[in-house]
Amino acid sequence: MKKLILALILGFTSILSAQNSVSGKVINLENQPLSGVSVYAPELHKGTTTDENGKYEFKNLPNGSFRITFTFVGFTTQSKAISKLLKENTVDITLTESVFEMDEVVVSTPFNKLQSQNVMKVEHESIKTLQQKGTSTLIEGLATIPGVSQISTGTSIGKPVIRGLSGNRVLVYSQGVRIENQQFGDEHGLGLNDAGIESVEVIKGPASLLYGSDALGGVLYFNPEKFADANTFKANFSQKYFTNTQGSNSSIGLKTSTDNWKFLARGSFNTHSDYKIADGERVTNTRYNETDFKTGVGYSNSSFSSVLRYNYNKLDLGMPDNGIGEQSTSKNTEFPRQGIFNHLLSLNNVIFFENSKLDVDLGYIANDRSEFEDSNDASLHMKLNTFNYNAKYHFPKLGKIETIIGVQGMHQTNKNSGEEYLIPDATTNDFGVFGTANYEWNNSVVQAGLRFDNRNITSQAHGVEGEEGYFLPLDRSFDSFNASLGYKTKLADPLTLRLNVATGFRAPNLAELTSNGVHEGTNRYEIGNAALKTEQNVQTDLNLEYKNTHFEFFINGFYNHVNNYIYTSPTGETRDDNDVFAYIQNNANLYGGEVGLHFHPHPLDWLHFETSFETVTGRKANNDYLPLIPANNWNNTLRTEFKIKNWFEEGYASLNLSSTFSQNNVSGFETASKGYNLVNLGFGGTVKLGKHAFDVNLNGNNLFDKKYIAHLSRLKTDGIPNIGRNIVLGVNFNL
């Protein structure tokens, strides 16, 4: 141990004096310089752009290994691995033209490679692209990604669903740390605002190898807004207006960077009235108000990179209790309502050694949730405080083998102070250790990993034994071993095959273990089961991709077997006129996939046609259908790109038809849902007025005011339709 510590100290001090730089030139195949290419080093949070001669320069770089990516609209992204730097280094890049979306570095998987190089298929979407679709919330935008849906309560509350799994079976990461906000409840939303978020990555399938418990169904990984390029200052103001809810989204941000220091801050405010259905009536008390603030400061030099970020989010949500009642455009919520405060503090560090590096991420999340029935005295008040940590050591590359080992953990406390207890006061502790390796040869890659986890949950007794709201004391420990194996190869130059097999697990949550009372979100009496076992699954994924200059096609298939799947089942009893449901377990299977294509006909360089189809089926071992499985969906988009002389650039117009099929494969406590078609229009671009420019976008969602009820809407049981026609106008000014 002493020798290891001494080696780390010597390695650290040897790079303190390093003052390395990388410079070069970016050109196209005709040897012409490319101006405005984004050059970015993700581990350093450092970026710049090429000048009019295609030249760029990075200063104060570490001796250790890192990556630099080169991205430019209309060209294929390149990622360059940098190691063993001299004082001055030259890296010249030649980019080739591409009509499809730019390739992106995937942060949520172990080795941070471009998606085209990644063993696992990960969906990557920029928040700007999702915002261009005119959605009013982040979760609405996410639900447009193939394989992702939402369980909604009006327009204000949405929970992500990945291939039929949701709640505690889907993990959410933001600012590099795990988000914990009582996600077991269907009426508990995502708790994130899209302002100040750069992009989202979606892992569809078990990811317990990297993320531990609860990553059984997948991961939503939100990448925060990038800092400004070195030695620049940027500020912007954006405003959106929504006709349906008479809503407004406002955001203002600024950021600046030197060669070493970085700073950014962004504030936003969203306010919406009750949403209007197709016949013109409003759904009472679906109004909401949201305040969000994000800030960050970063420092990097030749030895390490460190970024401290903070996010404050306040939500005031009305709960639709009486369906379509009093008609109002007020934005002041009525009873019942929810008040939620979220504080997220993260510290992300990368320490560089000569041929290796150490990542250390620390996070603290404070979630304060209050529910008010008929007065400003909270009937339910829960405070969830979570500290988590994640450390990964990247070994020096050994030939063609890359290796990572890591530890991960969490300490969490839940405290109640309201009249009602939904779950007891409790403490949860997680610890996990893992290792993974990547071997690459010719056109093939193999990636494998192993992990061990332990979760311990202890809770206190509460209430009077035999009465509603009584909780027995609990002390349970859950262990799990998990593994993953992935293979990627090029069957031919344009055809790529990916095959992944991975296991995942989820320990029962507090509600499943301890519930004893009426769950207001479901209007039923729920009884927990302290003897529940860990859910354990194994999923096989097959992905085929074909891509040439003008045509792109993909097909994703999966089969997910879950042992000890936890769900509620009626006991046949009633208490206080509520049906009694108990938590039980059974094995389950989910299977399905996504298929799609992107066609860009030559020589019509301005025209794109995209289509995708997604399906998932879930069954218990007795062949009954699982609840909350999204209906099949077929999505078609025709998109044009254009430019009008010198005053309108990066213009686009899109026509979208989203066809959701009937859902007849329902559990015993659900009803079937009818299919529907929604037509959406989009238009936008950059308006240039002399030296000034601003972005504008105009969307018409549900253009023909279709009356429909989504299968995963929690208002479906009351026969309340989803939102009607919504015209959205947005502008963004660079100040």
Over which residues does each language-model region extend?
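Flexible loop and strand-edge segments within Gram-negative outer membrane beta-barrel domains
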Residues: 272-280, 284-290, 303-386, 413-414, ...
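Outer-membrane beta-barrel signature, preferentially recognizing the C-terminal barrel domain
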Residues: 327-348, 425, 471-496, 503-562, ...
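Transmembrane beta-barrel wall of Gram-negative outer-membrane proteins
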Residues: 23, 243-271, 281-316, 337-354, ...
